[in-house]
Amino acid sequence: MSIRRKLAATVATGAFVVVGLATAIPAASAAEGDGNCTSNDAGAGGDLCLYFNSYEAGARFNDPYTDNYAGWVFKAWTSGTAGGSNGAGVAVKNNAASVQNWDTALTGYVYYNSNQQGLKQGFSAFTAGNLVSGLKNNNASQGW
């Protein structure tokens, strides 16, 4: 076999292996909170819950510490007769309309930019409300 044919066969085999690997690797899925907003996460205070819709409606995202919403999605939830699924699976970053603070003492803040930067809105302990127009569907992180 000539060098050209060997090289062509090697390249073709390598391409087949690369294509096979590319199709065998599953796509990474977005992370989601458990959807259970609580006032005590293992002694760490409570969750700051973001909702897809105004007035604490629709799917929600909960986490006490998120300095960047990228990669997180809203999750459908139910609790007794309440619940929401509108927006489930949608990215949290730049898609929240309202917030509920389940912390027992701290004010939770939602920020326009990642890493607690830019315009922010605070929610005192055990309060809720709609995000202001500059943050509604323009949210990137949270902090205390």
Residue positions per predicted region:
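Compact beta-sheet-dominated domain cores in extracellular/mature segments
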Residues: 2-22, 26-144
